[in-house]
């Protein structure tokens, strides 16, 4: 068992990400998230960036769900053989 542990330690040690790489990734995330882009200050904690990123992803999921529901309702109200129905089905991946 200890040999397994030491093997794992070597593997994780070789694939560890540096603090500079983490800072770079957090900075890139900060520029991608609209809420953080709007802020005047460049100094935002990594935890805040990750929190806002998670919130942003949750909001995107909700938007996708809402749009999918709206498209489904629209599809239900169109003729199955119409061009509009074909387009909606392609958007919904049916």
UniProtKB/Swiss-Prot annotation:
Identify the stretch(es) annotated as Disordered: 1-20
Quote additional remarks.
Gain-of-function mutants kdr-D (T-DNA tagging) show long hypocotyls, pale green and slightly narrow leaves, elongated petioles and early flowering. They are not sensitive to the gibberellin inhibitor paclobutrazol during seed germination.
Listed CDD domains? bHLH_AtPRE_like
Family matches, as PROSITE patterns: BHLH (PS50888)
Q: Name one GO biological process term.
A: regulation of DNA-templated transcription
Where does the source fall among the domains of life? Answer: Eukaryota
An example Gene Ontology molecular-function term? protein dimerization activity
Q: Which residues form the bHLH domain?
A: 6-60
Q: What is this protein's expression induced by?
A: Circadian regulation with a peak of expression at midday.
Q: Which gene encodes it?
A: PRE6
Q: Which UniProt keywords are listed? A: Cytoplasm, Growth regulation, Nucleus, Transcription, Transcription regulation
Q: What protein name does the entry list?
A: Transcription factor PRE6
Q: Give one Pfam family.
A: bHLH_ILI
Where in the cell does this protein reside? Cytoplasm; Nucleus
From the UniProt record, list the coiled-coil ranges.
none
Give the GO cellular component terms, alphabetically: cytoplasm; nucleus
- Name the InterPro entries for this protein: bHLH_dom, HLH_DNA-bd_sf, PRE
